[in-house]
Amino acid sequence: QPMRDVDFSGSTVVVTGGACGIGRAIAEAFAAAGARVAVLDVKHEETASLLEELPGEGHLCVTGNAGVEEDVRSFAEKVLECFGRVDVLVNNACITRRGILSGCSFEEFNEVLRVGVSAPYLLSLLFRDHFSRGASIVNIASTRASMSQKDTESYSAAKGALTSLTHALAMSLSPFGVRVNSISPGWIDTGVFGVLSPEDAFQHPSGRVGSPEDIVKAVFFLC
């Protein structure tokens, strides 16, 4: 449901990994609030269905791999061709290839970094001169950056790097009038992990796992 008293009419919002889970909830919420939404996601069917289901008109949903430079550059070009500027960039896309106990290879490890760290940097660079004054970049990091579990080296490293990238981008883009922040969710019930256990809930001070809507509210607050 649209959040009350929130209006992003006329804004261009870019969301990576926006066809499923947290990213989809963010894309749908911005569209419901009047924004024009541009989504990049590697999952073709989910990306196509999102375009049909988003409230409003004029959205852009592109199937592409955030870990492939050519796909990221092509997506950025399409965004600027369609909308001319960017008001909000949500870097949400990430993958995991497990870690050292699972024998995560050098290439698999770097694939995770390309999707979770290099793509946010490249999009920030490509949009640098096209952000509106007062634009916002929100990077979806994770508590895994500082509170990890075994066999999560690829994902944890990517989220830790994304947190550090956030600090640096905030300093570098401040003269452009661009704000840069990150959100570090804990367990979020997106359905991807099946039924989460009571132990997962007890990790959080609230005593429950989060919902995608919790992250949407945090993103809106930062934008």
What is each model feature region?
Residues 124, 158, 166:
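Active-site helix of classical SDR
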Residues 129, 171-175:
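Alpha-helical segment proximal to the catalytic Tyr-Lys
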Residues 5-37:
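Canonical Rossmann dinucleotide-binding motif of NAD(H)/NADP(H)-dependent dehydrogenases/reductases
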Residues 182, 203-223:
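C-terminal helical subdomain
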Residues 142:
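Residue(s) in the substrate-gating loop at a strand-loop-helix junction
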Residues 100-101, 105-110, 193, 200-201:
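Substrate-binding pocket helix/loop in short-chain dehydrogenase/reductase
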Residues 102, 134, 147-153, 175, ...:
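Active-site loop immediately N-terminal to the catalytic Tyr-X3-Lys motif
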